[in-house]
Regions:
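Sec-dependent signal peptide recognition
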Residues: 2-10
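C-terminal motif of bacterial Sec signal peptides marking the signal peptidase cleavage site
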Residues: 15-17
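Aromatic-residue-lined binding/catalytic grooves and analogous aromatic/hydrophobic interfacial grooves
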Residues: 24-376
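Prokaryotic Sec-type signal peptides and long signal-anchor helices
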Residues: 12-13, 247
Length: 376
């Protein structure tokens, strides 16, 4: 904990004097700002890597042969006025003020333990209407929308070499690359804020085949494929908030759907474009009323004539206009090692100025990816 505090203190001090404006938005080649691992993630919290476009956030594991990309939309929350007829805006405790005089008296008498116990009991929210799917009563929580599972299908024994996954902070791109049975595989992921889509590109040096499925823990009320666009509709049990997901597959191979599984065959590449929306509307008193299907369809209509390079260039221009405003140079890092090994070394007091630089810029990457105008 002390080490992390030291990193935070250093980057805050240095950042005050290291800001500059860059309007050219040219791709950077700073390899010190590439954070990478040499193995797939097994834990969502500590190893999976985040992406976002201000509306959708996703976490990718980099699995082989199956990739999992977990994602959600920023407004997909339980709770709210539609979660219960007697909703009072979040476990409100209307009697809390009555205990303030007693608390003040206890504190004046230096009876702090008693004051703390009373405050914990009477000044905090009272959980109401708890039920199996609403453990904290009216206190809602962000929900996982679901996961894409994308599997390379092959009859060969699946051995891999030269594995690498990570995030290039210069571009805001996630990546996975490896070799299996003489075939080079490459994945490029990014969130595009201007076009409101998440983009996942899979490439291979020889034609390959894939299966793609979308799993959600919530109730679904519709699944359809028309052309190269797949859609899924569902809702939350807690407050009946509706959500919709559109996915578009572009590929040089064949694409078809059977049941709720998408098959991409004989492809050197395919690109999965993902849009998601909910019925949330920022209007009192119900905060509901948007049409998520219409929102997603409009997003896809707007990119209907756009190529992958168009969408890529839009993302780079938008991201780098913000990211390139600040440079921080503390010294050479140990970027020949994966980030998890560097963290272990750092915890053992091995100097790694580049790691401190990465953490500073990684924080900025998360803010750019997760908090944009129009989002939550």
């Amino acid at each position: 904990m002390m080490i992390l505090k030291a990193i935070f203190f250093i980057i805050v001090l240095v950042s005050i004097s290291c800001s500059k404006t860059n309007t050219e938005n040219q791709p950077s080649t700073n390899e010190d700002l590439i954070m990478w691992y040499n193995k797939p993630a097994t834990d969502w919290m500590t190893e999976a890597l985040p992406l976002g476009n201000g509306y959708i956030g996703s976490m990718f594991f980099g699995g082989v042969p199956t990739e999992e990309i977990q994602f959600t939309e920023g407004s997909l929350w339980t709770g709210g006025p539609d979660s219960h007829p007697k909703y009072n805006f979040g476990n409100n405790n209307p009697d809390a003020h009555e205990f303030l005089p007693v608390l003040r008296e206890l504190m004046a008498e230096d009876r702090f333990d008693e004051a703390n116990e009373l405050a914990q009991k009477e000044l905090t929210s009272k959980i109401q209407y708890a039920r199996p799917t609403q453990y904290y009563g009216e206190f809602g929580a962000q929900q996982n929308l679901g996961s894409f599972f994308i599997t390379v299908t092959t009859d060969k024994a699946y051995s891999i070499s030269d594995y690498k996954r990570g995030i290039d902070l210069n571009t805001g791109h996630g990546f996975v690359q490896y070799t299996s049975d003489g075939i080079d595989y490459k994945r490029t992921y990014f969130g595009n804020y201007p076009d409101k889509v998440m983009v996942y590109r899979f490439e291979s040096s020889e034609p390959s085949s894939y299966t793609i499925s979308l799993s959600t823990p919530h109730y679904t009320s519709g699944f359809a494929m028309y052309g190269n666009i797949i859609s899924k509709t569902g809702y939350l049990e807690d407050n009946n908030m509706r959500f919709h997901v559109n996915s578009r597959i572009d590929s040089d191979g064949s694409v078809h759907c059977s049941g709720d599984t998408i098959y991409v065959n004989n492809a050197n590449y395919f690109v999965l474009y993902n849009a998601a929306a909910t019925s949330y509307k920022n209007e009192f008193p119900h905060y509901s009323g948007n049409n998520p299907m219409q929102i997603c369809n409009t997003i896809f209509d707007n990119i209907a004539s756009s190529t992958y390079n168009d969408i890529l260039n839009n993302q780079l221009s938008d991201y780098q206009e913000l990211f390139n405003r600040v440079e921080l140079e503390l010294g050479k890092g140990n970027n020949d090692k994966p980030i998890d090994e560097r963290l272990v070394d750092y915890s053992n007091y091995t100097q790694d100025l580049g790691l401190e630089e990465i953490y500073f810029q990684y924080g900025r990457y998360l803010m750019i990816s997760g908090s944009r105008k129009g989002g939550m």
